[in-house]
Amino acid sequence: MTTEVELVVLADSEGNAIGTAPKATVHTKDTPLHFAFSTYILNPRGELLVTRRALSKKTWPGVWTNSMCGHPGPDETNADAIRRRGVDELGLEVDSFLDIQEVLPDYQYRAVDASGIVEWELCPVHLVRLAVGEFVEPLDDEVEEFEWAEPQKLFDAVDATPFVFSPWMVDQLSAPELRQAILEAFDAE
């Protein structure tokens, strides 16, 4: 039995793909710049899925964060990677995603967790709307717990207690265009 190695696409400072590396070897104290994606998932009631990272995660264990993050594989679009991770991480069906909207296409961040592990990613941010009747059943090794939150209540919590949330989520939600897109999607529901 062979296990397929998950690859991450490495990037240069201009945002060009320059190669790949196994995901298991990338997140270290000297993490190279690489491609990723970040998602904010809305249910049909317009609530946002907020997840608490599993305690077994290598980086930011137990921290509350956005709905889902991940890495597109070589020759994989962000939309396809989002669907793949939605199935693998959150237990969703591949056709659960009604709409995947890229809101912050040029988002990039670098953050260091308490253990010294670095995240350094070119990480477009997406807003995802789920179909009616879809249920989230996260894998235990990915998500410790989850909540559905009204967008404005989540924004207020992030503003009041940013230390409770992942640094990328706090930074992403400081972008007015992301908050506006979330509120517009919430109001449309």
Swiss-Prot record:
Binding site for Mg(2+): 89
Assigned EC number: 5.3.3.2
Keyword set includes Isomerase: yes
GO MF annotations, alphabetized: isopentenyl-diphosphate delta-isomerase activity; metal ion binding
GO CC term (a single one): cytoplasm
Catalytic activity reported: isopentenyl diphosphate = dimethylallyl diphosphate
Binding site for Mn(2+): 27, 34, 71, 119, 121
Annotated pathway: Isoprenoid biosynthesis; dimethylallyl diphosphate biosynthesis; dimethylallyl diphosphate from isopentenyl diphosphate: step 1/1
Cell compartments where the protein resides: Cytoplasm
Superkingdom as given in the UniProt entry: Bacteria
Positions of the catalytic residues: 69, 121
Family label: Belongs to the IPP isomerase type 1 family.
PANTHER family found in the cross-reference section: ISOPENTENYL-DIPHOSPHATE DELTA-ISOMERASE
NCBIfam families in the cross-refs: IPP_isom_1, PRK03759.1
Protein name: Isopentenyl-diphosphate Delta-isomerase
Species per Swiss-Prot/TrEMBL record: Corynebacterium glutamicum (strain R)
Gene: idi
